[in-house]
Amino acid sequence: MKALKRWFQNSKLAREWPINLSFLGILPFFFAAGGCLLYTSDSGAYLMTARSLSIPLDRSVFYSLYLRGLNDLMSLFTQPILGEIVVLPPLILLFVGIFQLVKKLFPTLQPSNPEKLDYPLTLIQRWIFLSMWLCACFLTSMPWFLLQAMPDIFTAILCIFVLLFLQTKSLRSSIACALVIIISAVMHNANLITLTVVSIAIWLAWKGYLGKWTHPLNKYVSISKTRSLLALSLIPWALLIGSNIWGGNGVTVGKGSHVFFMGKLCENGILKTYLEDECASKPNPFCAFKDSLPEHTWDFVWNSHGILEKTGGWHHSKELYNQIILGTLSKPKYIALHIQAAISATAQQVVLTHGGDGLTPLDTSATLTQELKLHYPDEYQGFINESKQQKSQIDFDFYNRIYDGSALVLLLGAVFCLYRRPNPLLATFFGIAALFILCNAFSTACFANILARLNARDFWILPMLSIGIIVQYFFATASKQQQPI
């Protein structure tokens, strides 16, 4: 609440109506959460890493660096408020990104400057932008991710700025989009995989390797732009590997990545098959547990008294785990199982679109509470006394029923509008957004966990684009009917 008051009192941006519009959509959910941020069980780890500046075993350090950097910057001028640090930069990036998407994807006969970041829009574009922003706020789960002290909102920002990067023609705007893409990608390990897979898929399609049907798409996105995106996708990998080298973890994306991969092998059943085939001739410590493997990745990774601790733990299991992982990737039988498991996991993940996953009451003696108490006393008091998350007073079932119904109606409506009035530009970028969401489902389901939170964090972009397509269709239809015969 203190962050909100200070924003309206002191910020010049707060006196500009477009930025205020962004707050009008978010405020109801801010109050629905009790005027507090939302937290998951991982939020405390990010805050702790931000203070220690250590390289974690199980996640990217860059979201913690983002929190620490903005905290130190704010402390030069005023008392840092966690709500401002967590919410305002992503909110502005989302607002600007969606604003620019309207200008790029919904051109009119009298367009505003397509490259300059200004506010003037034509009347039709204003209605499209207003409908898209309000849809994102009230008909999708976007606000719940924006209010979380988590890096998940940066996955949606990544998707939006990938769309902008592909459509932008000026060098200056391309550089600006590229910087946002890099920053968003390094916030979460899965974002790196998503960006790389999307970039490869788009480049292959535009090169024609997926069929001649892709050739007409070159008029909307140049082949050179797809190559640039592919090259750009390598930079976050270099940054993440560099951070681990700097932290003494060696040349690796994550020192604990082998643990997560082994957890996935437990979950998809490949490890059990491998052990049944190999234990007789090549026994290893896992053979004693082949009939009692955990059903889910998180059970393997986070059970402090589970198989992980009995087979070396985080620090002494890498050699054994990598030997087994490479063993499952060296024979056609296991490779086929990997492909089958990836398809199945992606299919399960991509339909999980509900908000509120992980936003349950948290242990008040855990790391999160200690970090808030030491460094953000106002947020600590709100978390302890006012947070409706802590009181289980946020009815996510109610909101999710709205989101499900809205998504179904809007997606079907967009497909109908594109069928009745074909728009190759919109269809192309709608397809790219859908591809991004599918690739995010693949990367999170196959290398992390099958959780609604990991898919819903960017799925909301499709309903938002859908309402823009529908509004544009009705404006175009009305304009055609008004033309004299």
Language-model-derived ranges and their functions:
Residues P28, F77-L88, A341-A433, I437:
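Membrane-interface anchor segments at the N-terminal boundary of transmembrane helices
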Residues P143-F154:
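Short acidic/glycine- and proline-prone juxtamembrane loop motifs at membrane-interface regions
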Residues F154-S173, C177, I181, V198-S199, ...:
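Specific aromatic-rich, kink-prone transmembrane helix
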Residues A33-L47, S54-L70, M74-T78:
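Extracytoplasmic catalytic/substrate-binding loops of multi-pass membrane glycan-assembly enzymes
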